[in-house]
Amino acid sequence: MKRFMLFFVLCSTLLMACEPITPNGDQYPVVSADDYYWYNGEKIYLERGNQEYIIYDDALLSEMDKQKLEISESDSYLEEPNLKWGITKPNTVITDLEHVLYRMPSYTSEGTNFFVTHSFLVKLKDSDDLPILQNMAEQYNVKIVKEELFPLWYLLVCNLPSSSNALDIANRFYESGKFAVSEPNFMGGLVLHN
């Protein structure tokens, strides 16, 4: 029995340490149980890409790490003049993590990366539901920004100390059953560079 247990522990350890590798040496795409969003009542799973969407302090992030970004832009929703968002180059490791304030992996579809930004959309079931939205926004430490074009729709933005990322929080809002729609804000169409 002891030999069986030892064998089981060793095999389990080896299996956990293995990474799935394609014949040409690349890592197989990862699909995580946590990487999904809701669309029209259907759970849509996402396949991870090889880049990251980050929010960083432009004044403090090292120049070496800034050169690893494909895109670097300011965002009015960040409210801090030194904060910017950026997209890392494929398979890049940002070493100055202390000054990266928000990170989200990319996802891929047919060779094109797309990203979940730091924001998500929520549609109220009724205009009287605004206090419910405000309460949940406070609970998850996200900021509400009113979308003027569509009634009952609100854009919410993850603050830097938010309890999680925009994908996870959008899912939690939807799964609460308190809102008609809650879905992440995607940014995409960036072709992978090999």
Role assignments for model-derived ranges:
Residues 4-14:
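Sec-dependent N-terminal signal peptides
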Residues 1:
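Long, structured stretches of catalytic cores involved in phosphate-ester chemistry, encompassing
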